[in-house]
């Protein structure tokens, strides 16, 4: 099973991905860990080559969960996955979570450092995100037919359990069963 979880910053993608990975006994990957070099004190974008290699390494695995905010570099993963879980969380809640993340990073000294400027930029990005993602997913029929929207863990589990029966085209269901043997 290959699952992509997409949603804006502060939606809870990482939390949901970890719970799903535990429930389904498969690996999880944060796109931020591919996109950003997280070894320093500041956020620095990885090279296109490093990002591409990271994506290819994930695609080669039999099953995975990848979570991230939409970026054009995610496209190979979105095309490869069996199901796209789209998180829908109100902007006010995402804003609260992003501010909590910033305050927690101040207390814990987490690296790379979350700055107030970065946090404000994330809130602004989160505000614009929904329309951009909807436009992107709806413009590609190969992707739009895989999308199931949800807003909490139990709905995500239910979407996965029923997705292959009710929400995905027969061709995808057949491909998923064929891959399993």
Spans of features found by a protein language model:
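Walker A (P-loop) ATP-phosphate-binding motif of ABC ATPase nucleotide-binding domains
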Residues: 2
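Hydrophobic anchor at the beta1->P-loop junction of P-loop NTPases
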Residues: 5
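The conserved Walker
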Residues: 9
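Conserved lysine of the Walker
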Residues: 13
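Conserved substrate/cofactor phosphate-moiety recognition/catalytic segment
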Residues: 18, 22-62
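Short, well-ordered alpha-helix to beta-strand connector turns
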Residues: 61-62, 81-82, 144
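Conserved phosphate-donor/acceptor-positioning beta-strand/loop module used by diverse small-molecule
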Residues: 81-101
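NTP-dependent small-molecule kinase module
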Residues: 125-181
């Amino acid at each position: 099973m290959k699952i992509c979880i997409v949603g804006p910053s502060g939606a809870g993608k990482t939390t949901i991905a970890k719970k799903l990975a535990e429930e389904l006994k498969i690996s999880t990957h944060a796109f931020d860990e591919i996109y950003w070099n997280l070894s320093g004190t500041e956020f620095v974008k990885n090279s296109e080559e490093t990002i591409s290699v990271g994506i290819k390494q994930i695609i080669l695995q039999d099953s995975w969960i990848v979570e991230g905010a939409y970026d054009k570099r995610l496209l190979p993963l979105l095309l490869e996955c069996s199901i796209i879980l789209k998180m829908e969380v109100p902007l006010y809640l995402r804003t609260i979570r992003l501010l909590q993340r910033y305050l927690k990073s101040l207390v814990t000294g987490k690296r790379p450092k979350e700055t107030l400027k970065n946090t404000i930029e994330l809130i602004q990005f989160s505000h614009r995100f929904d329309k951009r993602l909807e436009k992107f997913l709806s413009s590609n029929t190969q992707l739009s037919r895989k999308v199931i929207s949800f807003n909490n863990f139990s709905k995500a589990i239910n979407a996965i359990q029923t997705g292959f029966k009710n929400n995905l085209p027969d061709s995808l269901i057949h491909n998923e069963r064929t891959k399993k043997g």
